[in-house]
């Protein structure tokens, strides 16, 4: 299989969304590796404003200078197929459409995830398959840099949730030899895979420490409230414009219906409550071991009771979020529940009652939140093997295991955690990071994004973090701001 880009194999499409139209040249479903495990997934599509080919420009960018916007569709560590500009899997106009309007080249690469199996029934989507595939896609672009539209030295990755974690990995593990055996296995090009910048919405990352971080935040709240997606049966038909055509989502290329959400409410068992306390007590030790500091040089630490400068730092960022809303003229205090934890004086957000704020947000997951002692989480499946569906990935949950589960190798866990590579001089890091974790997002602890941002900043990497007001677990909700950020670092 050739990895040469065929610039003559394209179509010109007119795409209209929300009253706006873009004409783009599309190069679709191009294999980016020579030996794919799931051929219908391990491919990419390229979308280019057609005006570039007429010698024109948009927003100061042309065919050769345009940044390459590289979103992924990974969620829950499931497979993430290519997604054309237009509608996303929820039926909303996606970031790729607006990126074209802003003058970017869009590259949408599919990637394997949990649930993918080959003809022999082997699990081929376990870690580190997803990040390996995305790296292979970057290498394909570099392999064809003389033919590919856009600037391959200005690749900006973007993702949400597990996709945000993948974006953070792309930005922290560039060209690292740890991934080389996996890249060779799928026949990736022998090229660089570092990227220029990474946009990470609510990254579900630092998985081997996510349980302790979650309980630091939510310990003491024993009732949980969430909504889960009820997946349709394999092979069940769908006329949904996106999900109905997503290859490999069910692991076998089956057609999928639009997602339906089912509420789940309950109370943790006494055993889970005890585990919550244990995990909570372990977080300060982990946080202090990182030796983090803020932009003023103040050490970020926690006392044994979970309070300290790190908590104050998180609260300070939450106050910035509230202040942004107040400055925009929004009456955020009209909600009596907000008034229970946020104090505003003379138009200034001055303090947050942390415990009341956490109670306002509510707990979403039982303890342990990610490495369940009885397994069954998306992350347990992520760390499976070709013939074992799921495994533990923390010593704590292995010690408290209730189902006789095995534990993943440390190397497999390391490959999925950007924290291990930020200080590694061999890894080429992105120059810029943008991290957004909604103020009411409960899928992982606020601490996870804060720790990632502090670690990046301590390494001298330009990092922009915020907790947008009222935003739950979501991404791409502030595209004008995202694109302003991209323009600010690319022009």
Residues of each region from the PLM?
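Catalytic-loop region of hydrolases
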Residues: 1-62
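C-terminal subdomain of alpha/beta-hydrolase-fold enzymes, centered on the catalytic histidine
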Residues: 316-491
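Non-catalytic, alpha-helical, charged scaffold/linker segments
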Residues: 201-205, 209-362
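Primarily recognizes the serine-hydrolase "nucleophile elbow" in alpha/beta-hydrolase
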Residues: 143-223, 413
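Short beta-strand element of the alpha/beta-hydrolase
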Residues: 44-46, 58-77, 81-82
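Alpha/beta-hydrolase active-site loop
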Residues: 124-147
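Short, solvent-exposed loop/turn and secondary-structure capping segments
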Residues: 56-57, 79-85, 117-121, 152-153, ...
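Cap/lid segment of the alpha/beta-hydrolase catalytic domain
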Residues: 71-131, 171-173, 471
